[in-house]
Amino acid sequence: MTMIKIAQQAKQASFELAQFGNVQKNQALFSIADALEQRTEEILVVNAKDIDYAKSQGISEAIIDRLLLTPERIRGIANDVRNVASLADPVGQVIDGGVLDSGLKIERQRVPLGVILTIYEARPNVTIDVASLCLKTGNAVILRGGKETKFTNAILVEVVQSALEQAGLPKLAVQAVTDPDRALLLELLKLDQFIDMVIPRGGAGLHQFCKENSTIPVIVGGIGVCHLYVEASADLERSLNVIANAKTQRPSTCNTLETLLVDKAIADQFLPKLAEHLCKLKVTLHSDDFSEDLQKNPQIQPLEQAKLRQEWLSLDLSVVVVDGIQQAIEHIRTYGSQHSEGILTSNYALARQFVQQVDAAAVYINASTRFTDGAQFGLGAEVAVSTQKLHARGPMGLEALTTYKWVCEGDYLTRK
């Protein structure tokens, strides 16, 4: 099937989907969750094909683990769909409004965006996560996963489409492009007459490719070169726990700490404690600021400047000593990705200065960067984390998958 045909079908499905209310959409979501559990064995057999292919291509164990589905993981994905069904539906919500002096009654109402194209890599759970969030908000979605998940994505979308059909919703509201040919992706990125938003979920290369080639608005995000600045007045013992959480809880995520900035005034006192604490947790520290004795530790390596602009996505941490808060802010402006940045301090005035001067989707005072997440922010599930400023910023929950329209009503009213 051609890309233009898929996009046309998605657009038509979005018109049909917009007519369904919250009850019907929730029924469809519950049907999807049930179908995932009922067809677990079938899904696992197909998933094994993707795992075998990944192993034959020498793909890393970390990526293979992301690809792998188990009965427990499928059950978790199904429960996530049920959780989406339990969330409040933003569609139809009146944001604000009133009656104007002219007598015109005006309301600003939330409505679906229309058609969303999501491009992602080796995460089959994203197929269901994004589909459920789009369906909840009345959007059609085109899913373009990586070649590593080709077979798994195909069966997951087939499960979703069957459940939609049984629930009386348009099954073509969820479609997949399983051919990894990049020329097809280029074609999709030009179909702005049918597709309303592109959400890439992957590395910096994928985001740059979409920005350079798309005529459709692209949500940029998910690249997390996140910093914590240990200011001179910080409680150093408690800071160690926050740093360890931000770095080690789940190193491969975009909200993980990648560079630690330490105030020069406390460096001699704090760096030995930091090394002792994090080396026990198997973290490798990359820095030129540790003492000669500490640098003998094989877990303390020289710092490569180029790494300051990259996500480690592993148990590695850059450590840089800075001369005060202004230098810390300048470092973040130079190397940060506008994702999540934090300060550890007991000085309220410096905390406010940090918040005002650091440009990021989420700014933290005395807390781990790991909280930048839709569920943690109380938004429910998230479709992505945006680091841009237009339309959406930070974790993108259901509201970020809507736009609004002005609804105006008069009594055969004319403008004077």
Swiss-Prot record:
Keywords: Amino-acid biosynthesis, Cytoplasm, NADP, Oxidoreductase, Proline biosynthesis
Catalyzed reactions per annotation: L-glutamate 5-semialdehyde + phosphate + NADP(+) = L-glutamyl 5-phosphate + NADPH + H(+)
Location(s), subcellular: Cytoplasm
Pathway: Amino-acid biosynthesis; L-proline biosynthesis; L-glutamate 5-semialdehyde from L-glutamate: step 2/2
EC class of the enzyme, as a word: oxidoreductase
GO annotation (BP), single: L-proline biosynthetic process
GO MF annotation terms: glutamate-5-semialdehyde dehydrogenase activity; NADP binding
SUPFAM superfamilies for this protein: ALDH-like
EC identifiers of the protein: 1.2.1.41
GO cellular component, one term: cytoplasm
Main location: cytoplasm
Pfam family, one: Aldedh
HAMAP family tied to this protein: ProA
Annotated function: Catalyzes the NADPH-dependent reduction of L-glutamate 5-phosphate into L-glutamate 5-semialdehyde and phosphate. The product spontaneously undergoes cyclization to form 1-pyrroline-5-carboxylate.
Family listed: Belongs to the gamma-glutamyl phosphate reductase family.
Protein's UniProt name: Gamma-glutamyl phosphate reductase
Organism: Glaesserella parasuis serovar 5 (strain SH0165) (Haemophilus parasuis)
Lineage of the organism: Bacteria, Pseudomonadati, Pseudomonadota, Gammaproteobacteria, Pasteurellales
Protein encoded by which gene: proA
